[in-house]
Amino acid sequence: MKKHIASTLFLSLLSILQLTAQSHSVKKLGIEQGLSNNYVVSITQDKQGFLWFATEEGLNKFDGTRFITYYKNDLPHNNQGITGNELNRVYADSKRPIIWIATQRDGLNAYNYDEQTFTAYQHNPENPHSLITNDVTDISPSTQNDDGLWVS
């Protein structure tokens, strides 16, 4: 009798778990789908739901259907452009419509996706408040200042 109750309880729990289980779909995204490079170093999602990919060959925005790629000197998207194509990290600002982009040897970029403009932050030896180096490897939000970032 105890075995019957235990097996009935087990089967009941198993069927409940199957009912609550969610199916996940996996979609392959690569060069064939429009990604600029298959070597993705960082991914973030902005407040509008778009995915942003940092690669060894540009910044990529995915809208669920297609990619838009931002390259250095790609001025049709804006009047300044991203400062480098070899990227280390992307971070979506949680308070502002900004994607922060860490580059290899070309500083930090802020892309305002509402205004579609880039702002570059680079090392300037004459400015003690500028970045200490143009090789930015990581970005993290500050827990002490709502608008602050830690960069390394």
What are these language model-derived features?
Residues M1-S152:
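Carboxylate-rich, polar loop motifs that coordinate divalent cations or form catalytic acidic clusters
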